[in-house]
Amino acid sequence: MSTSPNKNPQTSAADQYTKPPTDDPFAHEQEGFHKGLGARQLQMIAIGSAIGTGLFLGTGSRLQDAGPMLAVIYAVIGFFGYLILRALGELILHRPSSGSFVSYTREFYGEKAAFVSGWLYWLNWAMTAVADATAIAIYISWFGRYNQFFADIPQWLSAFIVVIVTVALNLISVKLFGELEFWFALIKILALLSFMAVGIWYLVFGEPINGVTPGLSLIAANDGFFPNGILPALIVVQGVVFAYAGIELVGTTSGETKNVEKVIPRAINTVIWRIAIFYVGSVTLLCLLMPYTAYKDAESPFVTFFDAIGIEGTAPIMQLVVITAAASSLNAGLYSTGRILHSMGVAGSAPKFTTKVSRSGVPVAGILLTGVIGLFGVVLNFFVPEQAFEVVLNIASVGTMASWAAIAMSHQKYLKLVGEGKYKRPNYRAPGGRFSDWAVMAFLAIVLVLMALDYPVGTYTLASLLLVIPLLIIGWYTVRDRVNEIARVREGYTGSVPVIAARPVVKKLVSEPRTHIDLDELDLEDEDKPKGS
């Protein structure tokens, strides 16, 4: 971006930013990015982005804890996930942005809220990167049963190599990311469809697996739907939330997608059947095919199934697919955090180096920063390889819930302003309106309570917020003045509804819907440097 002249050698933060040369006050968030994603890629990203380690690896331990009730839990969380995605879809049609819900939080609640939601989202994906790298390392060691070479590779070394290679691929171009995700998603989808086809065959023809006939009788013979009680079944909810992490990626890709108005609704509308088939359908089949006790903590339940039926070569092939799923999730996380950090950087909420975009349209610094945290996972895998996955999964789940809450809150505020005549809704609208948003937030609050009951990992994860919250407060007060200066350069506001740093200052708006409102039409308070809040 251009630099304002300043006679003082100590330039302020605002000197490095200029008022956007457009009526769109958020145009600066998109500078340097390329429209490198087409409908084919986005459709596949929407279908396959959230099919990752949560489903392929985490389901094994969840089945052990919750039993067959896990399928119902997947359906319930899938319903709320769909509501979240429809709300995000309406916000995207309102204004596409690579900053996704962080940019919408900035528009509707101001810079402080954007700072918190942005850094929590980054924490989510940074921890997901650790979980994915850990999962891949576990998957690779599985091949030790066939070749001692794989058994001898330290888990931390596999995680290190995975992080380095994935970061390097993400730094090339958005087009390469789109192609990688297209093929990753296609492999995952074909693998799940293959599993379901084989599983349905065994179910329909009653073919025994390890001497046990699959079907509903299998559930009855193994203590019913709640084999370990109701509370253990409910406590796994946060792990299932992690399995759905990534559905919001379609929002981050919107800023680099061609023909958004047509592509985004079509992509989001595929989600409901994706949830029904790939999540609820596959988990239901797992429950009907084998006893819940047959599944293991550190092994994909899909691999367990193919191992049990004894068809030579199917288990290793599925294990390779599972590695692909984890690599896809890691790839998507690096992509997403790079764009989110860029959006925060141009607003002053993240270090200025995160605004750097390469000639190929890649936010290099933001991706590298997340990659560095991914290397933290290497250390974690060195010291506590057995617990590494569960620890970071719980932390990432908290970040996912914070992201979903930010989307719901932004959407309900947007609809409130629509009701006041300050915005016009697109034709593609979220069902249920503001009621759906409040229902989502109530559900997320319940999940947090259940997470607190999951002693020790869940309890300690929530207790870690006692460290995260003070860090966020310190971070905000560290960057607040810079954020204020940059906001003033952008005409003193962060969105169509004027907000100085973190405080709405509008007394009066014109009655007809507008996409941009001139500062002259507004009555502003506190014209001096804002004190923040």
PLM feature spans:
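Hydrophobic alpha-helical segments and their helix-loop junctions in multi-pass secondary transporters
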Residues: 187-221, 284-289, 404-421, 479-484
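Membrane-interface "cap" regions at the ends of multi-pass membrane proteins
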Residues: 1-60, 64-69, 82, 86, ...
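A generic transmembrane alpha-helix motif of multi-pass inner-membrane proteins
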Residues: 195, 202-203, 391, 395-403, ...
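Hydrophobic, membrane-embedded alpha-helices of multi-pass small-molecule transporters
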Residues: 37-56, 61, 162-165, 219-280, ...
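Membrane-interface loop-to-helix entry segments
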Residues: 154-213, 268-272, 393-406, 436-439, ...
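Extracellular loop-to-transmembrane helix junctions
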Residues: 33-37, 47, 57-158, 271-276, ...
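C-terminal membrane-solvent junction of multi-pass transporters and transport-like membrane proteins
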Residues: 184, 353-364, 404-455, 491-494
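TM-loop-TM module centered on a large, flexible mid-protein loop between adjacent transmembrane helices
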Residues: 103-105, 110, 142-147, 217-223, ...
